[in-house]
Amino acid sequence: MQLIHFIVGLAMLISLSLAASDDRVLGWNKAHGLWGKRSVQEASQDKRTPQNWNKLNSLWGKRSASSFDDDYTTENGDDDVTMLYKRSNLSPRFLGRMTFARIPKISPAQWQRANGLWGR
């Protein structure tokens, strides 16, 4: 009787160890499929050009050399003041107390970056 229990126990132990190794192999294949094969495919995959990054352009602001030109100056400073009033979240009462001398010059490139990142 003890011999039968020993054989059954040994058979169960062997079957459990084989099942565990199959799970490990299956897990390795899943991991390889997620990381290894995908990485190889991406190397040969056609990428979008920066001009076709529509979703990124709407989220982060359009990326171009001119959008990062911080040396932008304008002859008419009223455009910058109007832009500041239009885009600010300050109350009209507070804005009424502000003088034009305190308003900093803000280039469109800075506004474009801020609009792309935080909306509005």
Swiss-Prot record:
<keyword id="KW-0527">Neuropeptide</keyword>
<feature type="modified residue" description="Tryptophan amide">
    <location>
        <position position="60"/>
    </location>
</feature>
<keyword id="KW-0964">Secreted</keyword>
<feature type="signal peptide">
    <location>
        <begin position="1"/>
        <end position="19"/>
    </location>
</feature>
<keyword id="KW-0145">Chemotaxis</keyword>
<protein>
    <recommendedName>
        <fullName>Neuropeptide-like protein 38</fullName>
    </recommendedName>
</protein>
<dbReference type="GO" id="GO:0005576">
    <property type="term" value="C:extracellular region"/>
</dbReference>
<feature type="propeptide">
    <location>
        <begin position="39"/>
        <end position="46"/>
    </location>
</feature>
<comment type="function">
    <text>Plays a role in several types of aversive gustatory associative learning including gustatory plasticity and salt avoidance learning.</text>
</comment>
<keyword id="KW-0027">Amidation</keyword>
<keyword id="KW-0165">Cleavage on pair of basic residues</keyword>
<dbReference type="GO" id="GO:0007218">
    <property type="term" value="P:neuropeptide signaling pathway"/>
</dbReference>
<keyword id="KW-0085">Behavior</keyword>
<dbReference type="GO" id="GO:0006935">
    <property type="term" value="P:chemotaxis"/>
</dbReference>
<keyword id="KW-0732">Signal</keyword>
<feature type="modified residue" description="Tryptophan amide">
    <location>
        <position position="118"/>
    </location>
</feature>
<feature type="modified residue" description="Tryptophan amide">
    <location>
        <position position="35"/>
    </location>
</feature>
<feature type="propeptide">
    <location>
        <begin position="64"/>
        <end position="85"/>
    </location>
</feature>
<feature type="propeptide">
    <location>
        <begin position="20"/>
        <end position="24"/>
    </location>
</feature>
